[in-house]
Amino acid sequence: MTLNYVLVVNGPVYGTQAARSAYQFALALLAQGHQLSRIFFYQEGVQNGSALTVPASDEFDLVAAWQQLSITHSIELQTCVAAALRRGVVGKQEATQNMLSADNLATGFEQAGLGGLAEAMLTADRVIQF
């Protein structure tokens, strides 16, 4: 039986295992034939969407991994706009609205409100939080 999943990632890109575990879980879901329609990054998890994250050359690049996963499997990557702005992860639209000189939301990520998460949860069979 194929299920539709939504993941909520609260853990930062580095510093805890939460985001990396979410990524590995996503790979396992897809390998088992399940559908993963959206990954919503909330609280500290919004840091997964920063284009300014530069891991050491011998470390796993989780931001790039999320981007590749999204491209390969057509998965939406959404960061909570309010949580992201508080933590300095800013998309083009928000940079313009707030008269900031730059944006740093990584390619493939979009910013959304909690309504985006609620919408995804309505159509999901399972919601898993990391």
UniProtKB/Swiss-Prot annotation:
Class of this enzyme: transferase
Alphabetized InterPro entries for the sequence: DsrEFH-like, Sulphur_relay_DsrE/F-like, Sulphur_relay_TusD/DsrE
Gene3D superfamilies: DsrEFH-like (3.40.1260.10)
Residues at the catalytic site: C80
Known function: Could be part of a sulfur-relay system.
Keyword line: Cytoplasm, Transferase
Subcellular location, principal: cytoplasm
Protein name: Sulfurtransferase TusD homolog
Subcellular location: Cytoplasm
Source organism: Photobacterium profundum (strain SS9)
GO BP term, example: tRNA wobble position uridine thiolation
EC code(s) of this entry: 2.8.1.-
GO terms for cellular component: sulfurtransferase complex
Gene Ontology MF terms: sulfur carrier activity; sulfurtransferase activity
Similarity comment text for this entry: Belongs to the DsrE/TusD family.
